[in-house]
Amino acid sequence: MKKEFNLIATVAAGLEAVVGREVRELGYDCQVENGRVRFQGDVRAIIETNLWLRAADRIKIIVGTFPAKIFEELFQGVFALDWENYLPLGARFPISKAKCVKSKLHNEPSVQAISKKAVVKKLQKHYARPEGVPLMENGPEFKIEVSILKDVATVMIDTTGSSLFKRGYRTEKGGAPIKENMAAAILQLSNWYPDKPLIDPTCGSGTFCIEAVMIARKMAPGLRRSFAFEEWNWISDRLIQEVRTEAAKKVDRELELDIMGCDIDARMVEIAKANAQAAGVAGDITFKQMRVQDLRSDKINGVIISNPPYGERLSDDAGVTKLYAEMGQVFAPLKTWSKFILTSDEAFESKYGSQADKKRKLYNGTLKVDLYQYFGQRVKRQEVK
């Protein structure tokens, strides 16, 4: 079994720096690239990063990299890799994905088929199985991916399974919810800290509020779910349980939090409450049915984070314009509060009524969105009577 692995955390565009910071906080040196963060680590690193990374999509093992301009080079390159260190006899190993960009090899189904053939031949040789007899694939699954960029192939195994945004607490979702990992990333990009009040005035299924509590209380986002690697025979159940137990002990239950989520839709408020209950944070969040225009607060130095309906989520432009204008009017008196608003509407600032201090381009799935950032006037608490 290998002791050290070349690993990558895949990331949505625009969030790479957040994931890089998370990887470093776990104690691993890393290299931030477009769409991914590279790092090295042992089996424990595979477990820890899956369990703890809030803003990443998946953790993958890089099995190898080699030039591949023709199919024979692809076959020989895949065949040369040390598959015996990963795939036990009986393993299922679908070539689940092939991606070819700016390369001579561009037929992705053919890349999948040839890669599969090469892995089969290597395992038949290693396990002394006759070539004419198909390998039985009835054991744990190892999803293999092949990426060819500028004629260089990278072959990977996915350790995660379902994407990391699937935390295991979402009982039901709204029409177009923000993904949990993106919500966690935006919270980390904001200037919110656990000692500040936090309000999501368009909370939907409660994702921002739930992720905020999990960040504040140091709750590992992967504690309530399982991962692909847990089925693999070379990662011991004992080590997995040890890392999970360590994570559970780090939860900080003492912290006092001031987090509120509001939505105009009573049904969404109930869904948000159920999700918070499933996440184990129901006691930390106040959920209310309330219109945006009814939001008031006499607290200071708070943070508003909102993913209001936009694009396909609101069918009429008039409704969008009215909502954004109301947000601008209601948030304006909250001068010490910072506001972070995510939308794909490029005319947001004119509808809201003021220009953002900063704007950050992100992707909510495949949809390009902007995070409009308005920074509050910071005052010391004793200055306010």
Regions found by a protein language model. Name each.
Residues 2-142:
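Non-catalytic nucleic-acid substrate-recognition regions in nucleic-acid-modifying enzymes
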Residues 44-51, 162-165, 380-382:
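Short, charged/polar, Gly/Pro-enriched secondary-structure boundary elements
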Residues 100-103, 162-163, 309-313:
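A short, flexible beta-alpha/helix-coil linker loop
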Residues 144-160, 372:
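C-terminal edge-of-domain segments
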Residues 155-189:
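SAM-dependent Rossmann-like transferase core, predominantly class I methyltransferases
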Residues 178-296, 312-313, 317-319:
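Conserved S-adenosyl-L-methionine
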Residues 290-385:
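C-terminal catalytic and target-recognition region of SAM-dependent MTase-like enzymes
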